[in-house]
Amino acid sequence: MKLQRRHFLASLLAVPAVAALAQTGPPLVEVWKSPTCGCCKDWVKHLEANGFRVHVTETASHTMRTQLGIGEQYGSCHTARVGAYAIEDHVPARDIKRLLAEKPAAIGLAVPAMPIGSPGMDGPEYGGRRDPYDVLLLQKGGGSEVFQAYR
């Protein structure tokens, strides 16, 4: 009987550890986008193909952009949040992963102006064209710096 009680108590101690493991896994990216935007849908597919879980809310993104602290000069096609960070427009999945690994004190990342060749803007309709662009790290105090350059 004592052995069964020990096993029962040990299993109770394991519950929080199992729950913690269940909460880990691929990061969840919450996306706010227009229901009619094809490039936004392609960006979501890019994130999923790179291991992210994605939850999409189809609505105008400007309200969330403001709530997340993204300046209008960085605003573009869609807005997202992953963990404590805001993501604006066609940011590559690899840069989001780097952001989550490095954990800088920042609002998040942005790729203004929907550059051709960025994820979601790289479909066959663009004929392989790739414009140079920068992924910007948005500072909490305002301003930005280049997080990653694509040339």
Residue positions per predicted region:
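Thiol-based oxidoreductase modules, predominantly thioredoxin-like and allied folds used
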Residues: 54-65, 74, 82
